[in-house]
């Protein structure tokens, strides 16, 4: 009304934080974004327990490696040995009553963009990328969830990248024995690249397409430690 030009530096891309769950809309519309599990918590046993079928992954130490025995649980139940038993862990629902989402899961970032940015496009139209200059993302992360960070296709991607099955060395992510340094390096490389490919690249591509400068910050005070 006063003939003034007002530029908005950036929009906030989330209901609260961390970015990615769209205030609960992403988990509500895409249950697989959270209900597949995000971590693997383990416990050791000197005898395979009778409830071993409750675990997602059961390993038996043999020499310097670990063998998956999920298909042989009846054979080893009650048998002494060194067993590593893994259960899936999940994000909690403190985010406005909704779970955070697995940014490593295929399609989650695209769903977030669809829900959040399409809403902004409907509201602001051509002002998005002109009057509104950028987008701020707040603490998107893939932090540990009571154990080893994991996503359903992680083992397959890891083996394609490094040529060996991570499950045969999984305990070395928390125990310092054998070739643990190489295993941890490879694990973090795969984990970080998945985060780049499945979160950062789709967000960057969208912002570039819409002439938006993308800024913000990751969970630097708590991840990846």
Model-predicted segments: where are they?
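Aromatic-lined carbohydrate-recognition surfaces of secreted/lumenal glycan-active proteins
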Residues: 2-13, 131-139, 187-225
């Amino acid at each position: 009304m006063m003939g003034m030009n007002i530029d908005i530096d950036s929009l906030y891309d989330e209901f609260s934080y961390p970015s990615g769950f769209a205030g609960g809309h992403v988990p509500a519309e895409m249950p697989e974004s959270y209900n597949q599990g995000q971590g693997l918590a383990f416990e050791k046993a000197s005898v395979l327990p009778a409830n071993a079928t409750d675990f997602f992954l059961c390993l038996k130490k043999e020499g310097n490696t670990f063998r998956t025995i999920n298909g042989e649980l009846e054979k080893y139940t009650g048998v002494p040995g060194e067993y590593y038993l893994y259960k899936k862990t999940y994000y909690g629902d403190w985010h406005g009553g909704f779970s955070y989402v697995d940014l490593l899961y295929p399609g989650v970032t695209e769903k977030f963009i669809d829900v959040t940015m399409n809403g902004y496009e409907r509201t602001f139209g051509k002002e998005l990328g002109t009057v509104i200059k950028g987008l701020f993302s707040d603490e998107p992360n893939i932090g540990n969830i009571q154990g080893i960070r994991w996503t359903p296709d992680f083992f397959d991607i890891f083996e394609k990248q490094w040529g060996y099955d991570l499950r045969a060395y999984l305990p070395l992510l928390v125990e310092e024995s054998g070739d643990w340094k190489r295993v941890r390096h490879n694990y973090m490389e795969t984990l970080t690249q998945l985060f780049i490919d499945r979160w950062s690249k789709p967000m960057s591509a969208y912002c570039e397409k819409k002439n938006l400068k993308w800024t913000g910050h990751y969970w630097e005070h708590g991840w990846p430690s």
